[in-house]
Amino acid sequence: MPAAVRELWRMLRPGGRLVLTTWGPNFFEPANAVFWDTIQAHAPELHKGVNPWDRISDPDSLRAMLADGGIRACDISTELYEHPIASPEAWWNTLLGSGYRGTLDQLSIPARERVREANLKFVRDAHIVAVEANVLYAVAKKSTA
């Protein structure tokens, strides 16, 4: 990530702004953990212990990564947000419309159906009506000198 930031910063004109967003802490919780637990149970080879954005999901780690990429001064803000889940099926559609689809598409049809049923059951039984969708925003302005 620092190398990509370094290249973006290099390409930015003097006086320009670089704006980055990343998922904040607890992304898609409380349902995220259940999703990955069911993946581990049905396709352990696809289980990810850490999501890539977890490395930069708080202001301090995002600031450190940007500094590693050559950005010394930036403003970082956090927006706490909940993504509404109208029904268990809406949660499944959220998964299908997210980066998690890459994992789901690698499952066999029977495994995918078991993961789907486990997730729908959790959302239904736990009465989940929203998941966390917190975001961090970083804005850095390149000096004109």
Each language-model region and where it sits:
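Conserved catalytic/acceptor-binding region of the Class I
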Residues: 2-3, 9-86, 102
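Conserved Class I S-adenosyl-L-methionine
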Residues: 51-145
